Structures are given as C-alpha cells and as structure tokens.
C-alpha cells in the first residue's frame, strides 16, 4: 500500500494492517512521500484514531531507520509520552539513576522539553552530562557507567522528512507517541508512562506486537504519565508470550504514603537539577523521593531484577541510601565528557 492509497483508506475510516502502516512509514522515512501527503496522512490518522497495529507497524520502521547503539546485554528505557500538563519534575530521569544503581543498564532515550519546562535532555545537560554523544559514545556510557542517554534528534535522521510537516500542522500526531517506542539501543525492557488510560492500553498492545521481553505501561492517578502518589495507578504488564495483564497499584500497597500531585511539581532547569541532586544524595526524603522510589521499582520489575513493586521499592531505597545511585550520575557525567 502506498501513502495515497493509505490516505484514502484512513479518510474512509478503515484501519490499516500493521504491514500497511509499515509500508506507509517506509515512504515517509525514505523521503519519497511529499510534505502534503505526509500532512494529509498524519491528520487523517489522528482524526480516525491510531490502532495498536498501526502504531506498531510505524514504530518498527522507525526503529529500523534509527542510528543504532550496540551494547552486548539487555538494556531498559524509562520514559513517558508527555503531554499530561502536570509539570512534575523529571521523575523518570531521576528513577533511571536509581535503577542503574540497583544493577540495571539503562539506555535512556529522550529530547528537550516539548510540553513541559524541562525535558530529560535539559535536566541531564544541566547536571553536566554531555547529551549529544554519537552511538559509540552512548555505548561507552552503557558499558562504563551503566546508564547512557540518546538525544532523539541525533539518532533519528529519517525524521527530517516528517519534522517540518509536524511543526507546520501544529497538532499532536502519531509521532508524539512513537518516540518512546523507538529506542535506538533496541531496549526490550521498558517502563512507559502514558497520560491517557485508553492510550496506555493501546501502547501496551503495540509493544506486545514488537520484540518486547518485559514492559510496564503505566498511567498515573489524575492523568499523569508516571506512577504517582496521589491515588491508584493503572499498570499494563507486557511480557513476551503472555496475555496483557492489568493491575491497579496504590502507594500504600508498596509501603509508601500518599501525597498530593502538587508535592511533585518541578520548575525550570536549575530547579529540577537541584531536585535531582537532592534526591540522589539522600538529602530530600519526602514525597519526591518516594515517587522516584516507586518509578524506579517499576523499572526493576520490568527489568526482571525485582519480583514485585514492594521489593523494588526496597531495592530502590537501598540504591539511594548506599550512594550507588548518585555514583551512577557522577560516573555518567565523567564518561560522557571523556573524563573517565
């Protein structure tokens, strides 16, 4: 199916198969689709609503076109789709260091702020990490620091064909949710935060169509794209060879206290950098630490090193209290800057 046929099908509200969506994405990613065709397709798909099969087909092509990072061993990614308007601090980025301190190798894939004030790239840069590394530089961080960061624009060169169109049409499209599914290090373990419950289930089903080994797709209380402390959280567990499993987990279920969403608010880059340092150093021991423990626990479960979230919280706490989480940050800064 070519993109003109796909536009006609989607306008008629017909869902594409995974293979058809992949075929269209090939045209977009190799530059043969025109800007007008890309805009028409993305807009029509947005109006119809993307299916998990369509998302998976497009993600598979985007993964293949990415500049790959090669690492000999399993890696996990922790990220969210954004767009929740909650203005929390960089929870998943902080949790990544805690998970790394507990033994996981974290291949974080992210960008600068889109809908927030401070994205993962912004806070890491503020912490002193060199964020614009090439594939070998990231692989070196994974090997020597246990955590690496892939700055999305640098690893998805084929996005140059769709990027200008996305900016011009100015609406959220399927590309807003493809980023977290297209890790250049081919992370087969993942924690993916989603602001919409319906989209969370859809992305969980999309991950099950890809080569995922174990993932937790989480939707926080109040529509946050992280596990949060304000109430019950919805979790979809994706495990290779198993049916999708749905869970509801409240903070008290894993030994943590509830806290209002306002307690997790972030600020500008300088503010969030100070927060990350305070949490990893053990100085901040309030709800911001607790929400990091909860999200790091999810990574430890998805990464198959913790049997359940309650155990994961204990392991995450030990990662901070032992100094291992902060050491991962210091190590990542040094390795990324060529100082180690």
Swiss-Prot record:
Pathway: Amino-acid biosynthesis; L-tryptophan biosynthesis; L-tryptophan from chorismate: step 2/5. GO terms for biological process: L-tryptophan biosynthetic process. Binds 2 magnesium ions per monomer. Mg(2+) 1 binds at residues 92, 226. InterPro entries: Anthranilate_Pribosyl_Tfrase, Glycosyl_Trfase_fam3, Glycosyl_Trfase_fam3_N_dom, Glycosyl_Trfase_fam3_N_dom_sf, Nuc_phospho_transferase. It catalyses: N-(5-phospho-beta-D-ribosyl)anthranilate + diphosphate = 5-phospho-alpha-D-ribose 1-diphosphate + anthranilate. Keywords: Amino-acid biosynthesis, Aromatic amino acid biosynthesis, Glycosyltransferase, Magnesium, Metal-binding, Transferase, Tryptophan biosynthesis. Mg(2+) 2 binds at residues 225-226. 5-phospho-alpha-D-ribose 1-diphosphate binds at residues 80, 83-84, 88, 90-93, 108-116, 120. Its EC number is 2.4.2.18. One of its GO terms (cellular component) is cytosol. Its cofactor is Mg(2+). It holds the Pfam family Glycos_transf_3. Gene3D superfamilies: Nucleoside phosphorylase/phosphoribosyltransferase catalytic domain, Transferase, Pyrimidine Nucleoside Phosphorylase, Chain C. One of its GO terms (molecular function) is magnesium ion binding. Anthranilate 1 binds at residues 80, 111. Anthranilate 2 binds at residue 166. PANTHER family: ANTHRANILATE PHOSPHORIBOSYLTRANSFERASE. Catalyzes the transfer of the phosphoribosyl group of 5-phosphorylribose-1-pyrophosphate (PRPP) to anthranilate to yield N-(5'-phosphoribosyl)-anthranilate (PRA). NCBIfam families: trpD. Homodimer. Belongs to the anthranilate phosphoribosyltransferase family. This is Anthranilate phosphoribosyltransferase. It comes from Chloroflexus aggregans (strain MD-66 / DSM 9485).
